[in-house]
């Protein structure tokens, strides 16, 4: 059986997201022109949570969308017809916007690279910033997060899992050894 360690409990996750929300506001001098885009699946739920924090702080709703990266992944060689493809849902234009791309765990950077490609196919934002709940290191690509909830150095054989409840609210972050 895997040895599991809770890295962040529910209140720790909330504190991390609140801090990220404040950092996003500070860096962008408010919410004007700001949109949130979560990477399916975990990043979407975290983007929604981040949007709620921004409303609590600023009293203004920030548009929130989702990007699916299935067809942009670089670890798929042909035979893509059998892949479960999610849906990219951007109920707003990203043209000229400040996009905050949100994901649960940053590891090799390959998911983020795929998300950047998918976003650029949707338009040309003025900037793209990256917010992640956990950065575990081990990059294969030169990608770094602008906003990080928690840095958790891991070995390549370990895994980080962000758990969500039935309402898709993050409940804890677990290190699996």
Swiss-Prot record:
Family, as annotated: Belongs to the purine/pyrimidine phosphoribosyltransferase family. PyrR subfamily.
Superkingdom, taxonomy of origin: Bacteria
Alphabetized NCBIfam families for the sequence: PRK05205.1-1, PRK05205.1-4, PRK05205.1-5
InterPro entries according to UniProt: PRibTrfase_dom (IPR000836), PRTase-like (IPR029057), PyrR (IPR023050), PyrR_bifunctional (IPR050137)
Annotated organism of origin: Geobacter sp. (strain M21)
A Pfam family that the UniProt record links to this protein: Pribosyltran
UniProt KW Glycosyltransferase keyword: yes
GO BP annotation list: regulation of DNA-templated transcription
Name this protein carries in UniProt: Bifunctional protein PyrR
Xref: PANTHER family: BIFUNCTIONAL PROTEIN PYRR
Function statement: Regulates the transcription of the pyrimidine nucleotide (pyr) operon in response to exogenous pyrimidines.
GO molecular function: uracil phosphoribosyltransferase activity
EC number of this enzyme: 2.4.2.9
Keyword Transcription in record: yes
Reaction catalysis annotation: UMP + diphosphate = 5-phospho-alpha-D-ribose 1-diphosphate + uracil
UniProt keyword annotations, A-Z: Glycosyltransferase, Transcription, Transcription regulation, Transferase
Motif PRPP-binding boundaries: 99-111
